[in-house]
């Protein structure tokens, strides 16, 4: 059992480049998640409470406004495609440096928001930059690893993204006051001063035979298009589930169920343990069941735990949220591995960009459906969003069978 221990895994893979990629993933996870973590406070500050038994009467903005705002943020992530494609031209490290720097600066501008839609606009401008950074981090992690260490390092990098999102949620709970969200957004400026020394530790991946002619920006070789499309459908389904599963979490927990922000912060902190368990399970399942089986289990678990969180009271929310973090930890490394291992170096970042597009479209669809169904029911308390959860999360799960049209990538050597 020693080989499966957390300490052994970290010690074996904790090199300077891996540490740097972990921290970059943390920062790229922290900045955009501030929009989700503070959404209840933003809605309450900029919205208007009504007397009707609707979501707006509880949180200040309607489900449609919240859903459209979150969908706009997801739509903006489509810009990650050309930005990630630039990594196949400019190089991985140079692209990460530029996109992360600009994305953090724009995120911090949201601290000056005079309205809800200005807040949405700032995060929408920053979102593609930070999404492309996270995408290229996964690509670099895979390219600097071999078949034996790849999933371990993806687990570590996924942990970084999870820690970043968790820190955003914790700070949101600890910062008090109606305008405390402004301080959270301003924190995005802090990492800017450490980017250059951090990125010096990351070597530029080089592959033999990777110096051929470049295709048009965003173009994928014809022989790989069906593979990109299949992975895209899978990621679309994951997006439909994960978009509203995370997007409305804090609105429902703090706004509808009236859970104290400090309690929410405590739940998020404890969820670090379940998230870690999910990452370790992902490492185990990705090697025993393969990437495809792990993705199926993780996606179904995400849908079921989110339905539990939105379908009951405070206890169901806490259990659903914490088990949902476990499901997310189980899913993230496996889908990151599959999305990068199936493609050659020359088009890997571009393919990853198209896969991000599919996830964005899925998340937008999920958020819009969830918001519209949520508006159609009386939001009076526990379980009010149960119907929205079931209608959104469950219908597309059979599409996961398409995974078995793809080759198992766990033992593939990168080209």
For each feature predicted by the language model, list its residue ranges.
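Extracytoplasmic gate region of multi-pass secondary transporters
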Residues: 35-37, 225-279
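Helix-breaking motifs and short loop linkers at transmembrane-helix boundaries and internal kinks
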Residues: 60, 91, 112-117, 146, ...
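Cytoplasmic membrane-interface "Motif A"-like loop-to-helix N-cap segments
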Residues: 89-100, 287-299
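Cytoplasmic helix-loop-helix junction between adjacent transmembrane helices
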Residues: 122-159
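Glycine-rich segments within core transmembrane alpha-helices of 12-TM secondary carriers
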Residues: 150-176, 191, 356-367
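Extracellular/periplasmic helix-loop-helix junction of adjacent transmembrane segments
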Residues: 39-79, 262
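C-terminal ends and interior cores of transmembrane alpha-helices
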Residues: 101-114, 300-313
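Central cavity-lining transmembrane alpha-helices of secondary-active solute carriers
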Residues: 68-84, 269-281
């Amino acid at each position: 059992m020693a080989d499966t221990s957390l300490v052994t895994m970290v010690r074996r893979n904790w090199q300077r480049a891996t540490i740097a990629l972990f921290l970059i993933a943390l920062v790229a996870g922290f900045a955009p998640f501030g929009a989700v973590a503070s959404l209840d406070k933003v809605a309450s500050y900029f919205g208007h409470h009504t007397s009707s038994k609707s979501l707006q009467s509880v949180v200040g903005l309607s489900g449609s406004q919240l859903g459209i705002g979150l969908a706009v943020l997801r739509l903006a992530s489509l810009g990650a495609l050309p930005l990630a494609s630039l990594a196949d031209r400019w190089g991985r490290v140079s692209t990460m440096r530029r996109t992360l720097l600009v994305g953090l600066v724009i995120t911090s501008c949201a601290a000056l928001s005079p309205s809800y839609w200005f807040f949405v606009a700032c995060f929408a401008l920053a979102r593609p930059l930070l999404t492309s950074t996270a995408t290229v981090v996964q690509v670099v992690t895979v390219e600097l690893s071999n078949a034996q260490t790849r999933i371990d390092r993806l687990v570590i990098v996924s942990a970084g993204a999870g820690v970043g999102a968790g820190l955003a949620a914790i700070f949101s709970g600890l910062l008090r006051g109606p305008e405390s969200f402004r301080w959270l957004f301003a924190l995005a400026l802090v990492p800017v001063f450490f980017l250059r020394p951090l990125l010096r530790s990351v070597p530029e991946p080089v592959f033999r035979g990777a110096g051929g002619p470049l295709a048009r920006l965003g173009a994928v070789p014809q022989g790989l298009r069906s593979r990109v499309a299949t992975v895209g459908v899978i990621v679309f389904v994951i997006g439909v589930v994960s978009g509203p599963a995370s997007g409305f979490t804090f609105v429902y927990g703090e706004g509808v169920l009236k859970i104290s922000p400090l309690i929410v912060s405590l739940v998020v902190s404890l969820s670090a343990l379940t998230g870690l368990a999910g990452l370790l399970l992902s490492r185990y399942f990705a090697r025993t069941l393969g990437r495809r089986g792990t993705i199926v289990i993780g996606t179904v678990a995400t849908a079921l735990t989110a339905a539990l969180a939105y379908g009951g009271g405070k206890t169901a929310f806490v259990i659903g949220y914490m088990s949902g973090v476990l499901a997310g930890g189980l899913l993230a490394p496996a889908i990151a591995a599959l999305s990068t291992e199936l493609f050659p170096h020359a088009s890997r970042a571009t393919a990853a960009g198209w896969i991000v597009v599919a996830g964005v479209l899925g998340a937008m669809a999920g958020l819009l459906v969830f918001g519209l169904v949520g508006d159609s029911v009386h939001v009076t308390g526990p379980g009010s969003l149960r119907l929205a959860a079931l209608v959104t999360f469950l219908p597309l799960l059979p599409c996961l069978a398409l995974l078995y049209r793809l080759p198992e990538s766990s033992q593939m050597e990168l080209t």
